[in-house]
């Protein structure tokens, strides 16, 4: 509403390599399913399994989890409102937590 855009696109971007923005349903079981699924795909331990961790950081898994979940989402703006389907919401996924991070929001349209 603050942008005044009636028709266009809204970009929401996680501005860090170990965080993600995605769209899904806000349901507790689904959240736990995501946590379990991501941990199976890219387990945090053993730390030594990731070559990236040889740099002194222990977040190789966080980089992979971000890649799986994605960097950004784009939502249509229709009639001045974000055009979501039923149950859709925007979520921020934090996979490391070692430093402050930003989210970029850009609204483009008329």
Task: Please give the residue ranges for each predicted region.
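Active-site histidine-anchored catalytic micro-motif
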Residues: 1-110
């Amino acid at each position: 509403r603050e942008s005044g855009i009636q028709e266009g696109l809204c970009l929401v971007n996680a501005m860090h390599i170990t965080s993600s923005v995605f769209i899904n349903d806000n349901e507790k079981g689904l959240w736990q399913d995501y946590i379990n699924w991501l941990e199976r795909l890219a387990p945090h331990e053993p730390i030594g399994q990731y070559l990236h961790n040889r740099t002194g950081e222990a977040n190789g898994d966080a980089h992979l989890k971000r890649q799986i979940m994605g960097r950004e989402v784009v939502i249509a703006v229709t009639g001045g409102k974000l055009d979501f389907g039923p149950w859709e919401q925007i979520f921020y996924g934090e996979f490391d937590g070692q430093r402050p991070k930003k989210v970029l929001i850009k609204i483009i349209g008329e």
